[in-house]
Regions:
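An N-terminal, well-structured beta->alpha segment
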Residues: 1-60, 64-66, 145-168
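Short glycine-rich phosphate-binding loop at a beta-alpha junction
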Residues: 40-46, 70, 169-171, 273-279, ...
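N-terminal small/polar loop signature for handling phosphorylated ligands or for N-terminal nucleophile
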Residues: 41-104, 157, 185-246
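Active-site nucleophile and cofactor-binding loops and adjacent substrate-binding regions
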Residues: 69-78, 252-255, 277-278, 299-300
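Glycine-rich phosphate-binding loop
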Residues: 91-103, 225-247, 252, 295-335
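Gly/Ser/Thr-enriched, mixed-charge loops and adjacent short helices
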Residues: 104-228
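Phosphate-binding and adjacent anionic-ligand microenvironments
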Residues: 268-449
Length: 449
């Protein structure tokens, strides 16, 4: 039984039922119970049409090993992390996040919301599950429903000053995903007029894919911001762990800009603290951290690296350009909703439009991530390194090369034969020129002039 197609670097993900189905989920549940070696495991699920059957199979697999299940029912991924942290239990989330409706998947964590990835247990779980039905036990663990939504809402609200927040108008698009479960009860506790698009939980995602990183999927949100004169717009992905903002003019707020805003807010509360950012964040992020008296720590791309470095260094916050935001006081786990609530608090306190509040952080022009299919990613990276040898290189993750006025990072995908390129420059003109120059080398068509 070969499960390598669905076991990825950080989770399990595949097309239902061809790649992931109740039979496989049952075995994976039993395998996780054996590997985690805990008396109880928390289980949550998103609203995909296949999630109830996969949840039933996971419960069967887990309880067959005489392990009890704390069944959260519907959950966002960050609600599941809260359950794992507050109850001190290993946990499984059934979700395929922003993937199309035909997909589903599983995210795992250990007690205290500690990450489980390819190098921290996922490969062991895969090996156990590949034993097939022999991993299924004959035990009879109990299943206990548990509703943690109210406790989770209280937890999220601790990250901002609710009492002194001024009235705001907020547009939210949860894309029929799990944000429809967690966003309304949080916003109901704030002085917010909420315009909520696609709030209903619907695993067919009838309005648009639950993937806000694609600009096409933010069109309705941006129209709502302008139509209602909203102070801010928020787009959540399918399992509601990532958030993307737009300002009152319906202009994008990049993950780096929101990281800088949240970092500044956190450093006001804890001066001198350490803050983690990944290496494709804007130059603005470490600059803002230093300007506010903090210590920036640069990491590889990927949530397991951020969480590991936060745990090792005691950092209070970590941000990724991809829309993930991690908090020490949230068990080092990520929560788009906590980041959104902190942003609302800062917007309220500033008494300015969001575009003005963010102007000091919008310092550079960025390309966004550009993917290029290549036959040999590593050989291509070496060709790029040679072509741009006049810059300042580092190899923390792929290849980063810095110049005085611009920088780029190129790194291979974990799962496909492609390279991911990010470029940033001091001006739009320089960005355009240098992006084309790097792409020409990647595509084997040129070298820098």
């Amino acid at each position: 039984m070969d499960l390598s197609r669905i076991f990825k670097a950080y989770d399990v993900r595949g097309v239902v039922p061809d790649e992931l189905n109740p039979t496989i989920a049952r075995r994976i549940g039993a395998a996780f119970a054996v590997w985690a070696d805990a008396p109880e495991i928390a289980l949550g699920r998103d609203a995909r049409l296949s999630s109830p059957d996969l949840a039933a199979a996971l419960r069967e697999g887990i309880t067959s090993r005489d392990v009890d299940v704390v069944d959260l029912g519907f959950a966002s991924t960050d609600l599941l992390y809260f359950a794992s942290g507050s109850l001190d239990l290993p946990a499984v989330m059934i979700t395929a996040s922003h993937n199309p409706k035909d997909y589903n998947g599983l995210k795992f964590c250990l007690a205290g919301a500690k990450p489980v990835g390819e190098d921290s247990g996922l490969a062991d779980i895969e090996a156990l599950a590949e034993k097939g039905d022999e991993i299924i036990g004959e035990g009879h663990g109990a299943v206990r429903p548990r509703d943690l939504l109210d406790a989770y809402v209280e937890h999220v609200l601790r990250f901002t000053d609710v009492e002194h927040m001024r009235p705001l108008t907020v547009a939210v698009d949860t894309a029929n995903g799990m944000g429809g479960l967690v966003v309304p009860p949080v916003m109901a506790r704030l002085p917010v007029t909420l315009h909520h698009l696609y709030a209903e939980l619907d695993g067919t995602f009838p309005n648009h894919p639950a993937d806000p990183i694609d600009p096409e999927n933010q069109r309705d949100l941006k129209a709502a911001v302008l139509r209602h004169g909203a102070d801010v717009g928020m787009a959540f992905d399918g399992d509601a762990d990532r958030v993307f903002l737009v300002d009152e003019r319906a202009q994008d707020v990049s993950g780096s800009v929101l990281t800088a805003l949240v970092a500044a807010a956190m450093l006001e509360r804890e001066p001198g603290a350490k803050i983690v950012h990944n290496l494709i964040c804007s130059w603005a992020v470490p600059e803002v951290i230093r300007e506010h008296g903090g210590i920036p720590i640069r990491t590889r791309v990927g949530h397991s690296f951020i969480k590991q470095v936060m745990a090792e260094t005691g950092a209070i916050f970590g941000g990724e350009h991809s829309g993930h935001y991690y908090f020490r006081d949230n068990f080092n786990a990520d929560s788009g909703l906590i980041a959104a609530v902190i942003a609302l608090g800062e917007l309220s306190r500033s008494n300015r439009p969001l575009s003005e509040l963010l102007r000091p952080y919008r310092r550079y022009a960025a390309s966004g991530e550009i993917n290029t299919h290549v036959d040999d990613p590593q050989a291509t990276i070496e060709r790029v390194a040679e072509a741009f040898r006049d810059g300042r290189p580092d190899r923390l993750d792929g290849l980063t090369v810095e110049f005085d006025d611009w920088w780029f990072n190129v790194r291979p995908s974990n799962t496909e034969p492609l390279l991911r390129l990010n470029v940033e420059a001091r001006t739009e003109e320089l960005l355009e020129a240098e992006t084309q120059e790097v792409l020409a080398v990647i595509e084997g068509e040129g070298a820098p002039s």
